[in-house]
Amino acid sequence: MTRVFLIAGEASGDALGAALMTGLKALSPEVRFSGIAGPLMQAEGMTSLFPMDDLSVMGLAEIVPKYPHLRRRLHETVRAVLDRAPDVLVTIDSPDFCLRVAKLVRAANPAIRTVHYVAPSVWAWRPGRAAKMAPFIDQVLALLPFEPPYMEAAGMRCDFVGHPVVAQPQASAAEAAAFRAATLGGMDGPLILVLPGSRKGEVSRLASVFGAAMGRVVARHPGARAVLPAAPAVPGLVRDLVAGWPVPVDVLDPTGLPGPDVAARKRAAFRAADVALAASGTVSLELAAAGTPMVVGYRMAWLTMQIMRRMALVDTVTLVNLVSETRVVPELLGADCEPEALADALDRTLADPGPQLAAERLTMERLGLNGEPPGLRAARAVLDGLAQI
């Protein structure tokens, strides 16, 4: 019997953990789970040590007042791992919490194998993080195909297991066509997806510049229509901010709708759109999976931007550009993220989407599309690592 202690600290980690559990049960039916789980992992049969939401804090303003509670949860988790003495501890993303747990567990019981799921982006900045985690992490499960060499160079085993985006369902052509017809209402289009982010800070920074860019696009394309799927945490803020836009926008508000309906509508919007104006982040991979070309824009505090520019090791932040080894997705960051430049980039993309569509297809192939599901690949890697001990 294989005993696995899993730790997820946020919704994305819960999804990865649930898929990993499914894979482990398929490959090793006698597997037993314990740890910290969200609703998806609990649905796979795990009882959470405490609510995963206790760990879901972001930003200094949230962390400082909750630090004593987080510290208690940290030591409670370490004690639980040591008491259960699992064959393997799998920490999933959330490095600030998870890597502290792994470090303390390794110091107290070196016999417990440690696996971290989601490699830190050392290829982009702070490369020293790999060497710092190597003394207490035996194996890393990577989502991106170019990540293993960075982890292996620091002395850890690293397996590329595929990105979860390749396993996400996509809207059918009929669903996309129905959404497009309902949204455009007989106009010629184009249909433009506006994605200013999922967090209050980034939405507040990007909404005005994205709105001004849309004003310019609609002036050039009178039949254009903007659609904005609001993230669950910010629908009210989004509505307040877009009220001042120079053009109308259809805000897809998830409030009060069942989760499956929200997800289905979002998938239809992604596939139906001619182009997207998006904040930087993993949303670029969701757009690539839907086959929608994009322009990426992002603003942050001036000091943060200067620090990032000096520390960055790559010349692009867009994952489609990185995975496809192209630079076909336009990205306008910091002071370059201004309305006229965004509108011009959207125009160019609408006029010639072909290079982006080719890069998106290549990206999905390299991330594992049409291969073994990422959760099963991750499970196989974990079990293989145990077998090598």
Spans of features found by a protein language model:
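Nucleotide-activated sugar donor-binding and catalytic core shared by glycosyltransferases
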Residues: 1-389
